[in-house]
Regions:
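Catalytic centers of hydrolytic enzymes
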Residues: 108-111, 117-118, 134-210
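Hard-cation-handling environments
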Residues: 1-127, 131
Length: 210
């Protein structure tokens, strides 16, 4: 933390300039990357400092535990894989419409300074939709979520009934990158992959008028 604060103190203006340039570039992009893959053919060697790892008996449980022996420091060169290639892109949409049922999603958008509007009246609109064709779910929880991955969708155009108060999120705004990387289902850290839309995955019976 101290190193980061010192760096920002000395380079704050350059960081802000780079960030503003990135926002401007993204605003003008029509095709947006949403997933990446590591290029293992490209790497650089860096110096890594650590301590030898050993197993020792725990005074609490009596079982073995991992222990880093600070009397045995080491330094060695290791490969650092810091090159990634775009794996999948999407065409940036004009906007997203989020039904009111997903207020948790909208709250997180607002907390991240996304400008959100609401429809003033009921509307039937021809819009592009996604159908979830496949996905994988982790068997173990992470941060309280059973994350989805390798999500595959197909798009289709359909007339949809929207209600007054449904949320409208335009992509022509400084937070556009966050908007797209969370609302595109196939994006690595999308709200779909973080389980916020799991309600759509179960088969439901339509209401009975009795």
């Amino acid at each position: 933390m101290e190193v980061m604060l010192d760096f920002l103190y000395r380079n704050g203006k350059d960081v802000q300039k780079a960030r503003n340039e990135q926002i401007s570039t993204f605003t003008n992009q029509q095709h947006v990357p949403i997933t990446w893959k590591q290029d293992k053919s490209k790497f650089e060697m860096i110096e890594f400092k650590g301590y030898e790892a050993v197993r020792k008996l725990s005074k609490v449980t009596g079982g073995e535990r991992l222990f880093y022996d600070r009397t045995k420091p080491f330094t060695k060169m290791i490969p650092y894989y810091n090159k990634f290639e775009t794996e999948k892109t999407v065409t940036k949409p004009f906007a997203y419409i989020i039904p009111q049922a997903y207020r948790e999603v909208v709250d997180r958008l607002i907390m991240n300074k996304v400008h959100v509007e609401q429809l003033a009246e009921n509307s039937r609109l021809m819009v592009e939709n996604y159908r979830i064709n496949s996905f994988e779910t982790s068997p173990r929880a992470y941060e309280g979520h059973y994350l989805h991955s390798n999500t595959q969708v197909e798009s289709f155009v359909k007339e949809v009934q929207f209600r007054s108060g449904d949320y409208l999120v335009y992509t022509d705004q400084p937070a556009a990158r966050y908007v797209i990387e969370t609302l595109e289902p196939e994006a690595t850290d999308s709200f779909f992959n973080w389980n916020f839309f799991d309600g759509i995955l179960g088969q439901k019976e339509y209401f009975s008028d009795y």
